[in-house]
Amino acid sequence: MNVSKDLLRMLDSPLTLEQVQPLPDGNVGLAVLGFPIGHSLSPQLHNAALEELTSRDPNYKNWSYGKVELAASDLGKALPLFWECGYKGLNLTIPHKVEVLPLLSSIDEDADLMGAVNTLVWKEDGWHGCNTDGYGLEAGLKESLSVALENAQVLIVGAGGAARAAAAQCLRSKCQKLWITNRSPGRLLQVVEVLAQAFGSDRIQSFPLHDLPHDVLEVKELVVINATALGLKPEDPCPIELGKFRTDCRVYDMVYNPPLTQLLTRASHFQMSHANGLSMLVHQAARALELWTDQRISVAAMYRGVKS
């Protein structure tokens, strides 16, 4: 393994933008950008999948994936720099999924529908935006909680890029009812308006986080999804109080590190089925890596990479 590949793996600490340097000829870089980003497990699972892919096709032996801590204010100058340095694909997490939209040359149908981007693919005219979060969420819910979105009743907490993708995927997959709430009423209203334009308003209901409507509390087998960043820090409060809901709720926290958040601790207390977002992370990552390589990607290898 050469030095540049060691650097790109960055399994313990992320690079800053100032530390991003041109890669040696023949090397291809991939990375996740976010702020904060230290918690991200993406390098472990992507590099494990790339290692498995290289065993089938040696052309990928010089591909590596890292993580870069990037403030929102630096996104505009960062995107051309990554291409110049030899990066052909990027993932985006908080706070970049919506803010990146005006910086892209094009976006795919899913990203347009969801109003958010989590995957960038370099094309001749610049960065092309895609969204694999919706796919990852649906696959993760099925794998971790045996939840099918069709005919499900779903409550999403959040109004950022991840919440937009989750809400659009639920509606597109024919959920029966979608409730959505957020701390910021302005952002909540904006998301609901976009969703209503795309899917109609019949299945969508929003409400203030502090004022849970009675009807949602009575739903059987409600699926509760945390699409906020609350849970990344040990001191973070629970994004929504579960005590008033039925105990047959299924609770899914998109946060995966730490693996047991305040929300999931509360779900366990009330004996609710629950899971963290690792399964979503893995499935969205596999889809992204397929976009970059045009190859079949091993989900099993990604899980092995995280566990190692």
Per-segment meaning from a language model:
Residues 172-177, 270-273:
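Conserved S-adenosyl-L-methionine
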Residues 151, 250, 254-308:
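Adenosine-phosphate binding glycine-rich loop
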Residues 1-23, 137:
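Short N-terminal or domain-adjacent regulatory/targeting segments
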Residues 22-146:
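Phosphate/diphosphate ligand-binding glycine-rich loop within oxidoreductases
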Residues 34-36, 129-134, 141, 145, ...:
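Glycine-rich adenosine-cofactor-binding loop
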Residues 202-274:
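Rossmann-like adenosine-cofactor binding region
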Residues 175-199:
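NAD(P)-binding Rossmann-fold cofactor-contacting core
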